[in-house]
Amino acid sequence: MPETRTPIISFKNFSFQYRAQKQPTLHDINLDIYPGERVLIAGPSGSGKSTLAACINGLNPFSYPGKCTGTLTVDGVDAPHSSIFELAGHVGTVLQDPDGQFIGLTVGEDIAFALENSCTPQDEMHEITRRAAELVGIENHLDYAPHELSGGQKQRVSLAGVMVDEVKILLFDEPLANLDPATGKQAIELIDTIQQKTDTTVLIIEHRLEDVLWRSVDRIVLVNEGRILADLRPDELLSGALLAENGIREPLYVTAMRYAGIDITPAKHPAHVDSVVLDDADTEKLRAWFRAEPLPAAKPAPTPLLEVKGLSFGYSKDQHTLSDVSFTIGKGEMVSIVGRNGAGKSTLSKLICGFETPDSGEIFFDGKDLKDENIRRRARHIGYVMQNPNQMISKTMIFDEVALGLQGSGLTDAEIRARVEDTLKVCGLYPFRNWPISALSFGQKKRVTIASVLVQDPELIILDEPTAGQDFRHYTDIMEFLRGLNAKGVTVVMITHDMHLMLEYTPRALAFCDGRLIADRSAAAILCDPALIEQAALKETSLYTLANRCGITPAEKFVERFIAADREVRADGC
């Protein structure tokens, strides 16, 4: 039956070409979004999904000039011929990096910023600010400064700041990118709650499909190479192969069902692991696959490389960021460090690298006490890649940034050039070697910082959120590269919120909570332990839920067998 409602967003034969580019980024877009809908816009990096969003909120063409053809109407406004100020009254945008959206010195000031600009009377402004803060659950933090908030709290403030204008459209740009799994889950729940209370139209730009589908969406719009490839209900899209063909990871439980030979159709409602239809034959197929799939071979215990003994640290006398932490990481291991924001994970890496000095405890590297080793000497053996690439980058050009750490190393200019170019190739940056870093996306900048550390051939690499901002293809490229380094003997430690990464690439994980090490187990075992998941603010894998639904025990063995099988399938290029 044809749609009779009037769309709140309507693209008709719409194309957009940035002024600095020779070809359009968006080609002949035809898309209608209706009031009150919740739509996920998915696509790999560079697909055009962010450009599509920027046309809706007015960043294109008003902040980033370009040529528009066709028509785009947003809440009755001719968007390309309007203004960014006018569109801001219709579309509220929550950015990927909430720090980039903060303006006020306190939460209250930040939320009230738009009201101040419109000269709202003070009493009315206070009341609107209070209501917006209550709506997003941040009403008890109105006097807090931005640096006193967690990542999830900052995102709530950003959301409240756009809600004060009573916009009809909310646009979320990768809302899960910088959040721990539990907070990401809460963010999706918050978006769901806000939409139900306000009947706002919600657009979510995200490639972490399974995490977004924690709550229902009406449609998924798949974008690649500047074109809309699909506009389907989740059950329809998950039943086909379009996601995999376009570099978007389907939910793990869906992949497991495919491996077991289950025919996935829209009638099975595959959009949610709790409600996917599994008849007796499907359940038996999954059990038979589990019985037939061999367990990955156990590896011998490695020789210790990094030993941490009784480590404690606080940024002030009455604040204990880390308390009595002890563990050993062996040569050639690949280990993940997980836990909620503020659990002490990044602080631990700073202590290992020498950026901070522990209050008590010892750190040994290859049997040597590091207490007398300064940052520079430690950096010869231990490489560290920060979560925010902008905090590491100091050069204008990509090649110069990667080469910086080799200056004064005794290598000739030719040797430096060869090593830098080799590293850029394996990081997928060689075509951009002469580009300015300012022209790169957040994810591309991340790869530059990884390259700048890898070029120095460290024995141990610590990476803080190595795949943040990466689509599935680039995620796989980086992780396979790191796994290749690991296979050559380089020890890799990753601080991560990505449960897929934890499962796929790190046989062992260290889980932290409130500055304490609460688990040192296999990644699969941790993600199949509900109590531990809650304590460490993780998110149980959907494979655990699927195993339980099929009566497969122990669930962690099902998870381990799936990960081993999936790696083999992807290695074969299937």
Provide a role label for each language-model segment.
Residues 145-149, 153, 436-440:
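Conserved ABC ATPase signature
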Residues 65-77, 361-369, 378:
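Conserved ABC transporter NBD signature motif
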